[in-house]
Each structure stands twice: as structure tokens, then as C-alpha cells.
Amino acid sequence: MLQPKRRKYRKEQKGRNTGKATRGNAVSFGEFGLKAMGRGRLTARQIESARRAMTRHIKRGGRIWIRIFPDKPISKKPAEVRMGNGKGNPEYYVAEIQPGKMLYEMDGVSEDLAREAFRLAAAKLPIATNFVVRQVGT
């Protein structure tokens, strides 16, 4: 699963996920893309699960790019622990997603195959997504 190799600080504040994606919102590497329409957090497990669903569907053909990386640690206190006594330990990592962010890209397969692979991947994700095709000249 994806997670940072090193971090300057082990824990991070919650913050607010506002606005829409101004960077990473175009198809840059492949021919087809899966774009986020909603806002939310994708865990490393969800990103990997969607990747596996796509990879299994396209079999040996094509190439997949993951355009997001889970770099934000989410901490959690153990079960049945009283409040206070500091912040919990990092449990997993998430990628903060704004509307318009390109999540995955694919190349080397037909549009029908890519569309179906992205449909299977989107079923694994907790946010609304759209299938997009690269515009001519970009």
C-alpha cells in the first residue's frame, strides 16, 4: 500500500478540505482518466483496491497511472481508552480529494475496456467520479 517513507512530523491536524482542484485536474499521462466529482478522503486501502479492480479487468494490456498519493496521517485512539492523555497514534494515511482531481489514468486499451475498468474501480471509492477522455492538443 502507498504511504510516505519519511515525514517531518508524525501527526497532522485535521484541517478542512475546501475549494476545488486547481492542479492535477487534466489527463496528463494516459488517454483516459477517472476524475473526482465529489470531495472526500481516500485511504491507501481504497486506492489500492480500486487499482487492483482495474488491473484485473484490463489483464495484460494497457498501463495505469495513480495520480494521487495518501500523504496525510490519520491518528486514532485505541478502543475503550478515556479521553485526554494526548493524541492517538497514526493508524492509516489518506489523500485529501477535491472536486476535479484526476485519480487514475489509463492508456493502451480501447475506450470500452477503459470505461468498464474505471466503473469497477469507482465502485470501490467513496466519492462520485466521472470518466474523461484526453482532449486533442493537451
Curated annotation (Swiss-Prot):
GO molecular-function term, one example from the UniProt record: tRNA binding
Record keywords, A-Z: Ribonucleoprotein, Ribosomal protein, RNA-binding, rRNA-binding, tRNA-binding
Biological process terms in GO annotation: translation
Keyword Ribosomal protein: yes
CDD domains referenced in this protein's UniProt entry, alphabetically: Ribosomal_L16_L10e (cd01433)
GO cellular component, one term: cytosolic large ribosomal subunit
Keyword rRNA-binding: yes
Pfam families cross-referenced by the UniProt entry: Ribosomal_L16 (PF00252)
Region (Disordered): 1-24
Compositional bias of kind Basic residues: 1-13
Assembly information from the UniProt record: Part of the 50S ribosomal subunit.
Annotated function: Binds 23S rRNA and is also seen to make contacts with the A and possibly P site tRNAs.
Similarity section: Belongs to the universal ribosomal protein uL16 family.
Protein name per UniProt: Large ribosomal subunit protein uL16
Organism: Cupriavidus necator (strain ATCC 17699 / DSM 428 / KCTC 22496 / NCIMB 10442 / H16 / Stanier 337)
Gene assigned in the entry: rplP
